Regions:
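Glycine-rich phosphate/diphosphate-binding loop of Rossmann-like nucleotide-binding domains
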Residues: 26-29, 37-41, 45, 119-181, ...
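A cross-family phosphate/adenosyl-ligand binding-site feature
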Residues: 39, 45-74, 150, 168, ...
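Glycine-rich phosphate/nucleotide-binding loop
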Residues: 101-118, 192-284
Length: 310
């Protein structure tokens, strides 16, 4: 009861593992993050060599053993989720980052930041949108706004998403802060956090998280935000959050809190509902039609290459 009054949490505490070895800032940085998150009513399992009050240490000799131990804890359901610096997600699964934007201090989800939603760039960005909506809804945004970063494939992604909306999928598009508006976002929209979810490819998203978390430190120490986020994909139900080797204690603690929030809101139940709703609105048909449209162009390129060789 006393702990509940102190932390404001009376339910079952989320159990989150953290692999502490391998950081550019040493184990002490990771343990500092574990202690910070533990004060917020989270059971933190620190995988490494250090110990501290309020944190459960799982002793390992090195980073490789730490990863094996993390996977064991996840497989046995001894923990509800994990925060780590690298993880081999399967194709179809990618991570949704969460940052604090500088202009107005608004939080923004970056969909996506690591992993590969699809080998096709535009299909990947369409799927990233669904993954971003899942993460945002799990963090309490009932109708999150979606913006598409003005990168290669943005317009094709917009067309597919608007067709999905027309077919009944619940999606709310953000309006760019620029005078011409629209849901395709520019650089000032990134800085202002115009949409709740910024859709892009994972390489661009990775750079955005890096810049928005470490622009005040020169890049060697990620000081703000929640890291690169959880791996999300259809049928995937293992909560693994990604931080980088440059992530400082505030970001790692943010990632642990992000994980705890997803556990409490039952993110994978939200994901199931969202995928059903998207499929009902014809997501698979839209993706198949898009692939068919891109075939003639790729076949023409192949013919030209053959002609050059002959």
């Amino acid at each position: 009861m006393a702990e509940g009054l102190e932390t404001g949490s009376f339910g079952k505490k989320p159990r989150i593992a953290l692999t502490g070895m391998g950081s550019e800032h040493g184990e002490e940085n990771a343990m500092e993050a574990a202690k910070m998150a533990a004060k917020d009513g989270i059971d933190v399992y620190y995988i490494g060599t250090l110990e501290a009050d309020g944190v459960t240490t799982v002793k390992v000799a090195d980073d490789e053993e730490g990863h094996k131990k993390m996977e064991e804890l996840l497989a046995s359901h001894e923990v509800d989720g994990a925060v780590t610096m690298h993880f081999p997600f399967p194709i179809g699964v990618s991570t949704v980052g969460r940052v604090v934007t500088p202009a107005k201090g608004r939080e923004m989800f970056i969909a996506n930041t690591t992993g590969t939603s699809s080998s096709d760039r535009i299909e990947g960005m369409i799927k990233n949108t669904i993954y971003g909506i899942i993460a945002a809804k799990a963090c309490g945004k009932e109708h999150p706004t979606v913006g598409i970063l003005n990168v290669d494939g943005a317009r094709q992604t917009e067309m597919a998403l608007k067709e999905l909306e027309k077919n009944g999928y619940d999606i709310t598009f953000a309006e760019s802060a620029r005078a011409d508006g629209g849901c395709v976002m520019r650089g000032n929209d990134v800085l202002q956090g115009t949409p709740d979810i910024m859709v892009c490819d994972s390489l661009t998203g990775n750079i955005m998280v890096k810049m928005l978390s470490s622009y005040t430190t020169g890049g060697s120490f990620e000081a703000s935000g929640y890291g690169y986020g959880p791996g999300i994909g259809e049928g995937y139900e293992q909560l693994v959050m990604i931080v980088s080797r440059a992530s400082g204690a505030p970001v790692i603690a943010g990632a642990i809190r992000y994980a705890a929030e997803l556990v409490k809101s039952k993110v994978f139940e939200i994901a199931k509902k969202e995928f059903v709703a998207a499929d009902k609105a014809g997501l698979k048909d839209i993706l198949a039609a898009r692939k068919q449209m891109s075939k003639p162009a790729s076949e023409a390129i192949e013919v030209k290459l053959r002609q050059k060789r002959s």
